[in-house]
């Protein structure tokens, strides 16, 4: 016994190695091009996605991406590796959607169907997907996705949207 030989408690520390799957759900609708203070939402989305992706790669996790507008535009299956990560970031910067609208429910449904095992998912959006009365259209799909995956919502907005400037 090591503790008896050393005459002090011997503690062995193990670090859990787990391979998470990280999926970025990126809103590529027309509204992402808006921006008044320095950068557009598109630039902010790319920066946030890059930070999350690099963090995942450092932890040896798989990273995938799902681009959506009012439909799923593109799905990049989760993989490991720096070249895969750079491919995702390049796609976020250069991708041109075929539709203008936003349907968060469609993206969440696709996520729950495409990724069977529990994953860490990040929804990067301006969350401008509401009914005429202002209620979110994605509420039910969000509940289903949260039950299956660890879902974090990162709302990207322009400061001008929160406070309308007094122009007279």
Stretches found by the model and what they are:
Residues 77-80, 99:
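A general boundary/transition motif marking the beginning of the first structured unit of a protein
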Residues 79-82, 166-168:
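Short, flexible, mixed-charge acidic loops at enzyme active sites
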Residues 48, 103-106, 136-137:
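Short, conserved clusters of charged catalytic residues that mark active-site
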Residues 1-78, 120, 125, 132, ...:
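An amphipathic, basic-hydrophobic helix/alpha-beta surface used to engage anionic
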Residues 84-119, 131-132, 158:
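Von Willebrand factor
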Residues 63, 83-84:
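Non-catalytic regulatory/linker segments of enzymes
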Residues 113-117, 131-168:
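Von Willebrand factor type A / integrin I
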């Amino acid at each position: 016994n090591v503790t008896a030989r050393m005459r002090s408690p011997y503690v062995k520390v193990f670090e859990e190695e787990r391979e998470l799957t990280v999926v970025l759900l990126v809103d590529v609708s027309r509204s992402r091009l808006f921006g008044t203070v320095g950068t557009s939402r598109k630039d902010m989305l790319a920066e946030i996605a890059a930070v999350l992706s690099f963090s995942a790669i450092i932890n040896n996790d798989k990273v995938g991406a799902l681009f959506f507008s009012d439909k799923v535009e593109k799905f990049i299956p989760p993989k490991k590796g720096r070249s895969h990560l750079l491919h995702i970031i390049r796609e976020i910067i250069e991708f041109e959607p075929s539709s203008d609208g936003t349907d968060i429910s469609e993206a969440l449904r696709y996520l729950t169907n495409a990724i069977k095992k529990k994953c860490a998912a990040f929804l990067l959006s301006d969350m401008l997907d509401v009914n005429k009365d202002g209620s979110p259209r994605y509420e039910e799909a969000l509940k289903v996705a949260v039950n299956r995956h660890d879902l974090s919502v990162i709302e990207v907005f322009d400061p001008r949207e929160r406070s309308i400037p007094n122009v007279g």
